[in-house]
Design a protein with these regions (language model features):
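Acidic (Asp/Glu)-rich catalytic clusters
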Residues: 2-3, 37, 64-73, 99-105, ...
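Hydrophobic faces of well-ordered beta-strands that scaffold small-molecule active sites
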Residues: 8-12, 44-46, 76-78, 106-110, ...
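Active-site mouth loops of central-metabolism enzymes
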Residues: 12-27, 81-88, 163-173, 231, ...
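N-terminal beta1-alpha1-beta2 module of alpha/beta enzyme domains
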Residues: 1-74
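A conserved active-site cap/scaffold subdomain adjacent to cofactor or substrate pockets
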Residues: 177-179, 183-198, 203-204, 208
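Conserved, mostly hydrophobic/aromatic
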Residues: 8, 36, 40, 48, ...
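An alpha-helical appendage that flanks or caps ligand/catalytic pockets
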Residues: 2-4, 122, 128-159, 199-308
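Flexible, glycine-rich active-site loops centered on histidine and acidic residues
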Residues: 7-22, 84-149, 189, 197
Length: 333
């Protein structure tokens, strides 16, 4: 991998493609994880989404375990577990079990978004009154940290497995609140600029300026999320990128479904209005698409702008072989 870029990691949503199935998406995730491990990527993270026709990564801890089982060196983790959907003790037991089975390889990224709609939130038994969520989430993070740390004398409730594993916790988010909390707790921070980039620069500035050193993380450590489509030529990458553009256009219109097949750039232009295009491209402002040389220049500019310690890369490509090739070309860029 290029020495003038930060370490690269993978964010895989296990996207269900148009004409495909959830089973195919999960099998492709396992195959891509093996491929990216061989290419030298640092981490392989999967997300938590519920009741979405186009996303198969709902049982995050299960998927992390499956990926860890078919790989041997790459770090595997959640990007992330939506903590308000779960009891901290349960998450500690799940990831403590994973860390016990795969020591030194498990990451625990935490977010506070629902990852779904309100009806599904109710089905998940998540509290629908979010008025106090900004108070509850920090308490839950601290509680989870305590379960994974060494036990206190006479501690009445412990995570077994989990206690003493000290699974690295990351805070994920796209808000200034998340940046401030990560800084206050002395945790690494992953900004979700792959879909919500508006506050990226301000969040990183606040995170670094207010960071309180911790034993594990004496300095702030920032990861920036990107959409990257790499192909042999700029023209091919532009066509592959239309799948991502169509997906975000659907989100812009309030519709979510399988990842669409790519279209020509001219066909893409006919799909959206100027206002829709502006909105989608704003959401995709932290994206790179092109040949290896083009992508490298774009990532160098993002590194210079953000000072990112790591990039985590999503590749919403309809064809699995082309997706694997994109990560291959990126690793060599």
């Amino acid at each position: 991998m290029s020495t003038d870029l930060p370490p690269l990691s993978v964010l895989d949503l296990s996207l269900i493609v148009e004409g495909g199935s959830a089973g195919e998406a999960l099998r492709n995730t396992l195959d891509l994880a093996r491929h990216c491990e061989a290419l030298g990527y640092r981490r392989y993270w999967v997300a938590e989404h519920h009741n979405m026709d186009g996303v198969a990564s709902s049982a995050t801890a299960v998927l992390v375990g499956q990926i860890a089982a078919v790989t041997s060196t790459i770090r595997v983790g959640s990007g992330g577990v939506m903590l308000p959907n779960h009891a901290p003790l349960v998450v500690a037991e799940q990831f403590g079990t994973l860390a016990t089975l795969y020591p030194g390889r498990i990451d625990l990224g935490l977010g506070r978004a629902p990852g779904t709609d309100r009806l599904t939130m109710r089905a998940l038994r998540r509290h629908l009154d979010t008025a106090g969520e900004e108070d509850e989430f920090p308490r839950n993070v601290v509680e989870l940290q305590a379960y994974l740390d060494d036990a206190e004398p006479d501690q009445p409730v412990r995570a077994i497995p989990g206690v003493g594993t000290k699974v690295p916790i990351w805070l994920l988010g796209s808000s200034l609140f998340s940046a401030q909390l990560a800084a206050y707790l002395g945790l690494p921070f992953a900004f979700a600029s792959h879909f919500a980039p508006d506050l990226l620069d301000q969040a990183l500035e606040i995170y670094r300026a207010t960071y309180r050193p911790s034993e594990r993380w004496p300095k702030p450590h920032a990861m920036v999320g990107l959409n990257v489509i790499c192909a042999p030529t700029d023209d091919e990458a532009a066509m592959l990128f239309t799948s991502v553009q169509q997906r975000f256009l659907g989100m812009h219109r309030g519709r979510r479904g399988p990842l669409p097949r790519p279209v020509t750039p001219a066909e893409m232009e006919a799909m959206w209005s100027p206002a829709e295009k502006a909105g989608v491209m704003r959401m995709l402002s932290c994206a790179a698409a092109g040949s290896p040389a083009t992508v490298r220049r774009q990532l160098q500019a993002l590194r210079q702008r953000t000072g990112a310690d790591e990039f985590i890369v999503a590749a919403g490509i309809h064809d699995h072989a082309a997706r694997k090739r994109s990560y291959e070309l990126l690793a060599a860029a």
